[in-house]
Amino acid sequence: MSQSVSERTRIKSDRYESGVIPYAKMGYWDAAYAVKNTDVLALFRITPQPGVDPVEAAAAVAGESSTATWTVVWTDLLTACDRYRAKAYRVDPVPNTTDQYFAFIAYECDLFEEGSLANLTASIIGNVFGFKAVSALRLEDMRIPHSYLKTFQGPATGVIVERERLNKYGIPLLGATVKPKLGLSGKNYGRVVYEGLKGGLDFLKDDENINSQPFMRWRERFLYCMEGINRASAATGETKGSYLNITAGTMEEVYKRAEYAKTVGSIVVMIDLVMGYTAIQSAAIWARDNDLILHLHRAGNSTYARQKNHGINFRVICKWMRMCGVDHIHAGTVVGKLEGDPLMIKGFYDTLLLTHLNVNLPYGIFFEMTWASLRKCMPVASGGIHCGQMHQLVHYLGDDVVLQFGGGTIGHPDGIQAGATANRVALEAMILARNEGADYFNSDIGPQILRNAAKTCGPLQTALDLWKDISFNYTSTDTSDFSVTPTANV
């Protein structure tokens, strides 16, 4: 039933009465709100301060991440404030907790600048995480509408085009991070690259903190790496590469290093997450314009992504980075040395690889979302993995992944080339067994497949003997709220 003019006037008068009034009363809570296809949706895990009503806490987050301040301001009347206010429209208790709530908030798409992740995040996470009304706050998931997604370029190259360039289909890609990550000379660094690629890897990789230090300047590293790449490619007949880290202190220097990498023939460059969102988007645009693959190391992410009740779920970072336009991003291993619950990792991989996401609460996916025409982003599995885990890696991570064996290649007793060969033989044996219908994930059958392959591959046998007892059985801190799944790597 329509309201009378006098009733609408009274409501408006109450809303704009000078002073401090609850956020929910100011219009930031609307349980009857009908979500629009064009809305940006965010799901926050809210832990209200003792005595704070969860609905008011949700409304406060909605207000402070959109148009509100701590008191009523008359200049709201000069805007379409009823439209621009974010609306918290649903609050649910988090399963198996007593003080945490999932708050669903809708934002008008016009609140955000087109194609600017910096502007989107300035609102969504810019101010609310220090808000006194909540003792902890975590951004768990987002739905980005089709209309807003289309203002971002997405991955510069994408999974399909990368596979076409490498001529590798139906199998994970193999890589390794040069170790030690710091201290090598340029010549020795290039030798590591050559040995790894000659032994069967597709990629070598700079680590996140190798840029241009006194022991090895960036230009020296690029030249020796390309020498190793070219020699290995000529010897094997395969397209090879090494992720040349172009991260630097200024964008001018980033572009300088990127241009040099292109000039000397690299097919891929690398940046770190700590560069910042604007720098990442800029590098992605450059990579697409210059036809290079762009690898992103998620350096720094666990400072805000690991804790379950505060920060940003890495799933959201995956969405943001796919929008920004990176081609690769480290997304977890399940079985390695770094944080990784199986269901959470699967949710990250689906976010990067699927063209359409359906709601999947055990995977932590709360919203249905289409990726418009943005390309797929290749997940990278890195950190404490070795060839003895190959059956688990293939099972958990699938084909579209780069398996990065750093220590698991360079730590091989017979040398780097032997370590690379061990990984390649193990992978190809496991993929062959899978394609033939073997129950390769079985704890007896999977290891036996590797042992059989090792009968004709000495480096693989040596690796299996060396690392057979190595595992990282720790309970993950970030686990599904809707399913109990202990991390399994045995």
UniProtKB/Swiss-Prot annotation:
One of its GO terms (cellular component) is chloroplast. Its main location: plastid. Mg(2+) binds at K205, D207, E208. Belongs to the RuBisCO large chain family. Type I subfamily. It is found in: Plastid, Chloroplast. Its cofactor is Mg(2+). One of its GO terms (biological process) is reductive pentose-phosphate cycle. The active site is at K179 (proton acceptor), H297 (proton acceptor). The record marks K337 as: Transition state stabilizer. This is Ribulose bisphosphate carboxylase large chain. Binds 1 Mg(2+) ion per subunit. Pfam families: RuBisCO_large, RuBisCO_large_N. RuBisCO catalyzes two reactions: the carboxylation of D-ribulose 1,5-bisphosphate, the primary event in carbon dioxide fixation, as well as the oxidative fragmentation of the pentose substrate in the photorespiration process. Both reactions occur simultaneously and in competition at the same active site. The keyword Lyase applies. PROSITE patterns: RUBISCO_LARGE. Keywords: Calvin cycle, Carbon dioxide fixation, Chloroplast, Lyase, Magnesium, Metal-binding, Monooxygenase, Oxidoreductase, Photorespiration, Photosynthesis, Plastid.
